[in-house]
């Protein structure tokens, strides 16, 4: 009984060494890192996806790729990646973002979040999981339909 995996968000950016120690103590299968991202073009750095912290209230100086590299060194396996700009909008998934993550970090089992609007979005994703909150709530499709796609695609990610 109990939780088999925990999700860690802002702590991974604010106290990366603490989270690295958690990986050492509990192992890679017990931890999922939340990578809530927003596009940024800071004056001093290059444009890209940056990790947001504090419930999406502030952008950190850490790029998504840097975040994944740092924790990849300790065996990062599970990531929940939310494109904040699309969360709750039902405007479609940022498949380009998720494909870039999967291509650059193939060992990661990625869960996508933000923008799901249709069954077509589920078909287009090649992630290991997806958050379908608002689309399901608004009745864009049924849970059975979404699960059928998941069952059919199982093992293809």
Region annotations inferred by a language model:
Residues 89-91:
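Leloir-type glycosyltransferase catalytic cores
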Residues 30-41, 105-116, 133, 157:
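Short, basic, helix/turn surface patches
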Residues 3-86:
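Conserved anion-binding
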Residues 1-2, 17, 21, 96-130:
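Catalytic cores of alpha/beta
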Residues 8-11, 82, 87, 109-117, ...:
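Glycine-rich beta-strand-to-loop/alpha-helix junction loops that act as flexible
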Residues 19-26, 123-157:
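C-terminal helical cap(s) of enzyme catalytic domains, especially alpha/beta-barrels
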